[in-house]
Amino acid sequence: MKDSKGYLERMEKSMREKLFFLEHIDLDGKIIIDFGAANGALAKEIIKTNPINTTYFCIENNEEFFKECEKLKDTGVLTVSGLTEVEMWLRKNKQYGQDDREVVLICSSVMHELTPRMQKSVVGFSRAYCDYMIVRDMFYEYDSIPDEREKDILEKIICLSPRPDLMQQFFYLRGLSKESIAEYLLKYSYVENWNTEVHEKYLGVDWINIHYFETEEVGVEIIYENYYTNSFIASRVYNTFGIRMNWYTHGQLILKMKRMEVNDYE
């Protein structure tokens, strides 16, 4: 990552939003899996709450961030590069009832980076091994930009974009739609990492697939659900374009899982 410092700084600006689940779940005596942990910033904040009798996994495959997570070893954090390693640990430690602690899977600002197949696999992992699944990510509700505002918003983007070349590249790749307009406003300022950011589908989280598990058939309960407009992003967009973002940009979700039989969860 070209500008990892800038990436981490903007991630930490939304730390309060990422810790929303602390008001709804007691982490004492639980196994915590932080999927896509980056530099371990979320882990550090959770550790400050002094949870008792927990095992904390940071999962991160970026080499630079992996090393940062490893620095938390003295606090009891275990750093691994993938879900498979955690799966093996869970199978070993939960076999024959050796460890009956509940398992919490945290997916904070990471699901949008995954392909649909990988997202499905992560949700399947949560069904097989977890008692709770926590998701916080970007969100766009279909058609939430009103028809009468679409033209005005697009004109402001074209006239006021700080990098017209990058703006043109983005819409060439994404096409022109209300959803792509909303996505551009989320990412236009991340110039230093643009070659990576432009290809990430910010609004690619399959919330419908995740919500499938609230049906009685699979026995999943929604503990908490919230959709909102990120105030930091909304302020930045208004200052740049004079556009008021009166649509949701992010979602927060906590699911209480009923585990299925552990087979091939993919």
What is each model feature region?
Residues 106:
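A conserved beta-strand element that flanks and buttresses the S-adenosyl-L-methionine
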Residues 130-141:
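Conserved beta-strand signature within the Rossmann-like core of class I S-adenosyl-L-methionine
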Residues 147-187:
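Conserved Class I S-adenosyl-L-methionine
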